[in-house]
């Protein structure tokens, strides 16, 4: 039987073979295709990729952060999650209050210049310490703008009110499961200019059939090597959590990507991953005593039987 991970591996192959060379906002360069869809049957294992290690702890803590409506990286740092650091760090080193060494193009330079990397690591550690310990600093530089959590839980209306999209869609799944309006959007055009990184995963929709909950994500932009594996696991986890609260089984996670791209400095890593054979997907177990999705904490989520190939490191484009 074909392993479900081939949905992702075939995406990698397709883009490497047929992608168009494009410049991008970060100056790194990509090959990309427009419009691609993957499907994962969540009843047949949790799609945490096995051809390289994907850190479930980071996926889960980021999702819980989104679900809390939080937009400050302090919560993430408190859970040893550093995946959003670079975007917040950028706002600090570009501010008038920053007096350290020049950090221009720190993402690329830290990969190419060992002497600079020492300085970068020192400044990043100082930044993290300040976010964790200094409330004023955290409020100013740990804040990412009205990113995912804010849009999910407190979307601002023109009437000056807020909409809790996530809470509302869960209630709709319970009361009107056949609705075609089971949608949450993170793309708020008015707020996009103020965001550290405008939403890449922009809109998701739920679908209930035969007692199963499925989810489709529309992702406007997908970093195939670093980002997409996280997104697959994150929205699969979200589907499990909401199905749990609504008394449903899990169905499919359908992942639709607009600009699906591989950065030019990830080619070697992608080839290395494609040379590996997938292993069985792990099993996700949720604490049955937790009834609401908003009450889950890290200790309530368990992954069993995860035996991936080793991690493959790659630079992030900021």
From Swiss-Prot:
Catalytic residues, per the record, are 200 (nucleophile)
Family matches, as SUPFAM superfamilies: Thymidylate synthase/dCMP hydroxymethylase
PROSITE patterns listed in its UniProt record: THYMIDYLATE_SYNTHASE
The pathway it acts in is: Pyrimidine metabolism; dTTP biosynthesis
Give a GO cellular-component term. cytosol
Main localisation: cytoplasm
Show the GO MF annotations.
thymidylate synthase activity
Q: Which Gene3D superfamilies match?
A: Thymidylate synthase/dCMP hydroxymethylase domain
User: Keyword Cytoplasm on this protein?
Assistant: yes
What keywords are annotated for this sequence in UniProt? Cytoplasm, Methyltransferase, Nucleotide biosynthesis, Transferase
Q: What is its EC number?
A: 2.1.1.45
Which positions are annotated as binding dUMP?
A: 25, 180-181, 220-223, 231, 261-263
Where, subcellularly, is it found?
Cytoplasm
Show the InterPro entries listed in the entry: Thymidate_synth/dCMP_Mease (IPR045097), Thymidate_synth/dCMP_Mease_dom (IPR023451), Thymidate_synth/dCMP_Mease_sf (IPR036926), Thymidylate_synthase (IPR000398), Thymidylate_synthase_AS (IPR020940)
- UniProt keyword Transferase, yes or no: yes
Q: Which GO terms describe its biological process?
A: dTMP biosynthetic process; dTTP biosynthetic process; methylation
The text of the family note is: Belongs to the thymidylate synthase family. Bacterial-type ThyA subfamily.
On subunit structure and binding partners, the annotation says: Homodimer.
Q: What does this protein do?
A: Catalyzes the reductive methylation of 2'-deoxyuridine-5'-monophosphate (dUMP) to 2'-deoxythymidine-5'-monophosphate (dTMP) while utilizing 5,10-methylenetetrahydrofolate (mTHF) as the methyl donor and reductant in the reaction, yielding dihydrofolate (DHF) as a by-product. This enzymatic reaction provides an intracellular de novo source of dTMP, an essential precursor for DNA biosynthesis.
User: What is the recorded name of this protein?
Assistant: Thymidylate synthase
Organism of origin is Bacillus cereus (strain ATCC 10987 / NRS 248)
């Amino acid at each position: 039987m074909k392993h479900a991970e081939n949905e992702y591996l075939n995406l990698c192959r397709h883009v490497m073979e047929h992608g168009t060379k494009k410049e991008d906002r970060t100056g790194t360069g990509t090959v990309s295709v427009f419009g691609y869809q993957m499907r994962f049957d969540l009843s047949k294992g949790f799609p945490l990729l096995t051809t390289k290690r994907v850190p479930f702890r980071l996926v889960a803590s980021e999702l819980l952060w989104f679900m809390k409506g939080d937009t400050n990286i302090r919560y993430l740092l408190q859970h040893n999650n550093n995946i959003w650091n670079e975007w917040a760090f950028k706002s600090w080193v570009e501010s008038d209050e920053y007096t350290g060494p020049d950090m221009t193009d720190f993402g690329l330079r830290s990969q190419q210049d060992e002497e600079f990397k020492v300085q970068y690591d020192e400044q990043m550690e100082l930044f993290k310490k300040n976010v964790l310990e200094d409330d004023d600093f955290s409020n100013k530089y740990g804040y990412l703008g009205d990113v995912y959590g804010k849009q999910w839980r407190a979307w601002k209306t023109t009437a000056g009110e807020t909409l809790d999209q996530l809470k509302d869609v869960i209630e709709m799944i319970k009361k009107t499961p056949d609705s075609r309006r089971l949608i949450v959007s993170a793309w708020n055009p008015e707020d996009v200019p103020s965001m550290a990184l405008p939403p890449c995963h922009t809109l998701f929709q739920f679908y209930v059939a035969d007692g199963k909950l499925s989810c489709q994500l529309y992702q406007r932009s997908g970093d195939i090597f670093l980002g997409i594996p996280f997104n697959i696991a994150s929205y699969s986890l979200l589907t499990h959590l909401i199905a749990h609260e609504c008394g449903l089984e899990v169905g499919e996670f359908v992942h639709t990507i607009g600009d699906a791209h591989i950065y030019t400095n990830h080619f070697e890593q992608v080839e290395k991953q494609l040379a590996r054979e997938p292993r069985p997907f792990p099993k996700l177990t949720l604490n049955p005593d937790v009834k609401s999705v908003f009450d889950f904490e890290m200790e309530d989520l368990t992954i069993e039987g995860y035996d991936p190939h080793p991690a493959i490191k790659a630079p992030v484009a900021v």
